[in-house]
Amino acid sequence: MKEYDYLFKIIVIGDSGTGKSSLLLRFADNTYSESYMSTIGVDFKIKTVKIDNTTIKLQIWDTAGQERFRTITSTYYRGAHGIICVYDVTNKLSFDHITETWLQDIDKYATSNVCKLLIGNKIDLVDSRVVLADEAKHVAEQNNMNYIEASAKTDSNVEKAFTTIAKALKDKVTQYPSNAPTSTVNLSNASKVTTNRGISDSCQESSVFKKMNFSSGKCT
């Protein structure tokens, strides 16, 4: 019996220190640490979710935000069905880099129909906030993205963020079932991964991603 109906590859991008790893750990393992080590290269988590009686396996790639790792992480855009852009609501520069750096990388390396989601993290730091929600919503609308505010620390909207993009991917693949594939990825081809543990980990998941062709990148 099949363990899941769909397998989607999602990558998480954004500046270093925005809480990408914390969001992923909160979602995948329900854990949080104030002293989590910055990702070196690329790491990943796998989690299965149930949406509308459909079992969806998510392989979520956590990428390093430092400039020196961008050559490594750019290769993981290829074949991604969804991309989550994360900024820190208390760090204006991390927000500016969404349009100045990360969305440009998406245009350069990802497929044109990739599903995108913008997350404003660390909303628990109310007194330190410098990026307003309306400003972020405007950027999201201009770039065909949905927007969610979250806090990995308090677990606010974390599951909602990941299930939102998972549902959008599921809805699109069921809406266009007969379209030709544009993004079929065999995970065995990406088995060697540089992770934040400083070693080459082996991804044992060898299934092929569901074949999809999306008409729009927005998660609706």
From Swiss-Prot:
Say if the entry is tagged with keyword Membrane.
yes
Q: Which GO terms describe its biological process?
A: protein transport
UniProt keywords (A-Z) are: Cell membrane, GTP-binding, Lipoprotein, Membrane, Nucleotide-binding, Prenylation, Protein transport, Transport
Single GO cellular component term: plasma membrane
> Where is motif Effector region found?
36-44
- Tell where it localizes: Cell membrane
Q: Does the keyword field hold GTP-binding?
A: yes
Membrane topology reported for the UniProt record: Lipid-anchor
Q: Which SMART domains match?
A: ARF (SM00177), RAB (SM00175), RAN (SM00176), RAS (SM00173), RHO (SM00174)
InterPro entries for this protein: P-loop_NTPase, Rab, Small_GTP-bd, Small_GTPase
Gene Ontology MF, one: GTP binding
Q: Which SUPFAM superfamilies match?
A: P-loop containing nucleoside triphosphate hydrolases (SSF52540)
The domain of life is Eukaryota
Q: What are the binding positions for GTP in this chain?
A: 14-21, 62-66, 121-124
| Residues passing through the membrane, by range | none
- Lipid attachment (S-geranylgeranyl cysteine) is at 219
Family of the protein in this entry: Belongs to the small GTPase superfamily. Rab family.
This molecule's function is given as:
Protein transport. Probably involved in vesicular traffic from ER to Golgi.
Q: Would you tell me the protein name for this molecule?
A: Ras-related protein Rab-1
